[in-house]
């Protein structure tokens, strides 16, 4: 796009509005190079980047980027084979640090969907080795001792020698105090010296480095430290040489990565520029517009970014509309409206946000041309007309259907009749060539052209006749009208004179009355539209607040869930530990009493997570209150899910119950009544138990074939408990022959169980030594 339009619209001043939000010199350089483009894909990419950055700020409102300096020259020096100095290495170090922080930020970013920005974040390089090398340079511009072993050795020797010098000088200060003008160690020519009285200069052997202006003090480096000082000077030279060697070595290590580091710096600057755009959006309530590829423009509440307290206006430049002609008197804001349209298009095509409301749409133009003169004096010279006409002639030779044309005070500066005719002819030529044009004029003849000509629309700037001031409101579809009579009357001109004047142009008055009615209708429509916008803004604010609250609640929910998971994991770990201890205690006892089995099972039940707190279930509490328990009622013991029967009630209100072979004492809250019509078998853990009936009474069978030893012993333990609680007299245990390990385990278990009356292998026709029949005590 031509540079002249950017100068006319003061685009550089607009770009300067974004500078305070930038953090890097790379971002600043990219902003300065920013220019409008007609490539739709690039504009869409810039718009998408801004929208994604806005979404990122919702989740990370304090997102920032480490400030960095320009390193393009540094990288070029590396590529040319030059070695870098400490200051240049610090610039590279800063860029690598900024890159690492951005990569870390992106890796930990959640709840944001990124596509365009993700491409930039993922292109950043990781240089852990180089970052380690560059740690040799601290921020004060000093090479650290750990940069090399040789440097550390040299500096240790320097430190030791300097300590010796200080010790010697301190001793001499004490010994020769009466010979010194001051009790301090001075420095001259980089050497440590004593301020000796001139009368004692021959009493202290050494090298004279200076004499005071009065001649009373001689600065002597004592002979005792001369050799040490020379040694220090030599070590300092070695130190400088070693530092140069380190700079050369690290330069060689960085050199192969110069291009990658330069690319990283550019990406950091690009992300910084996108961030600055969004900060501008937040500060100025700007928006990312929609993009129309058919030159349709719809600007809602658009403002000129450089005008303080600018009035917001709507501009609708539809696809079929060729020209908008703004008529009316000068000083009403016509030129500002013209510039606002042009500048908004330039900003959007440069990938910048615009000062307008949501729903605004911009077109794409290959070129924008303008003939805008800031001089709006009524008396314009012929030379001014010639200058403008020369410019217009040049523009007419360059514009095409892909151009936007802005013409200010078209035809001004010459005879009004001729000027109006020229203006209409130029507009007609542009209309026939289908070139989108916005033009301003104060010629009344162009009002009729706008009304009578297809694809051309009149517009004007509102004028408040009550205050005699322009309101700067853009009234599209309403031609401008003269307010001369109204203004003259309000300024005190005789009504007779005003009436006489109005009678001379009755026909024009009819037109003015029509225009006045149109203005009133437009104002009424604008008021309704403003009310609608206020409601939309309130809804938008509420929507943002609800979205923010929703995100916060989700984060809190996730935090609480994570805490709950951690607590649950701790509880499970504790439960497993306690259950292991209970099982160890059980297995360590050779004889178990019935109540110990029940207590152990109850403990294990309590370790299981409870899905429902039955004691707080109001429905169950009401159901229990319908009928009080009585002796003989069937119950379910809540602590471990076993069935039993109430046998008696104690004086303290507790109940005795028979649960299998065991008598238990229970509080009423520890059991539930089982209704006869609702009795169902209580679900227990499945352990391959198959009940059968025979003439010998109730029996059960446990099949342990194919089980691992620990699994088999665990199932056997549960099976025997259930058999005892269900008053079974006899059970069968099928363990197979195999290696005999499980069979031996079953035998040992049965031997130490005091409830087992007897056990032995089954008959040959019932499994032989592969099965064991167990009989319990009555």
Curated annotation (Swiss-Prot):
The keyword RNA-binding applies. The keyword Protein biosynthesis does not apply. Pfam families: MSSS (PF20297), MutS_V (PF00488), Smr (PF01713). InterPro entries: DNA_mismatch_repair_MutS_C, DNA_mismatch_repair_MutS_core, DNA_mismatch_repair_MutS_sf, MSSS, MutS, MutS2, P-loop_NTPase, Smr_dom. Its EC number is 3.1.-.-, 3.6.4.-. GO terms for molecular function: ATP binding; ATP hydrolysis activity; ATP-dependent DNA damage sensor activity; endonuclease activity; mismatched DNA binding; ribosomal large subunit binding; rRNA binding. It is an enzyme of class 3 (hydrolase). GO terms for biological process: mismatch repair; negative regulation of DNA recombination; rescue of stalled ribosome. HAMAP family: MutS2 (MF_00092). Belongs to the DNA mismatch repair MutS family. MutS2 subfamily. This is Endonuclease MutS2. It comes from Streptococcus pneumoniae (strain Taiwan19F-14). The gene is mutS2.
